[in-house]
């Protein structure tokens, strides 16, 4: 179910209010309080290179380790890599707008979906710059991972600069058309991001030291987690057979453990989240 929060509501996201003069009602699913947590936007080209994808995934994983929320737009390429890596490593993320249904469902359960548009609104050329200004507004820092000279992510960087946000850019091969935008950002004053730890230290964050034993688990949840830790990739049916509980209960427990960032479930296969390996 999609919720809406009006402009005059006292709980309207403060980050959007502070950055935008023309803010509108926000439609959302998931945990709106994530907007109060430290966050970084990870954006870039849809036609990402293997280098760009690798950087996006590594940065998202690092964000999880520092306890930061990952924000992106769920476009192909860099955005999708960032969301996927964040979920795989037990993190939480926010994306705007709602597009990929499978990813949308997973983020809805553990993170936040956010849009200025009602369900059913078709994406138009003008909606993407609108999206980009929201992405930068709800983020504490913006990282452009890989971008050509006409990449839409450069609009996000421009919005961030107008909003007084720090823009980071990952340097790329100077002979690659896909890195022209990111390299130009650095030339024009963006912070060259060559050490991911420095970004999070700039935000005043330190690496998460939470342990599994510090997270409350019921007796059955603990049993399921132990089974998952003992295997590589197990099907839900295999786990149910080992523990001998009914399918409805095991499905509920899998969902709870995934929401707690302890496991990763995709295509019916369950594995321990990378952060806990």
What are the roles of these predicted feature ranges?
Residues 2-277:
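Glycine-biased, small-residue-rich flexible motifs in mid-sequence functional cores and linkers
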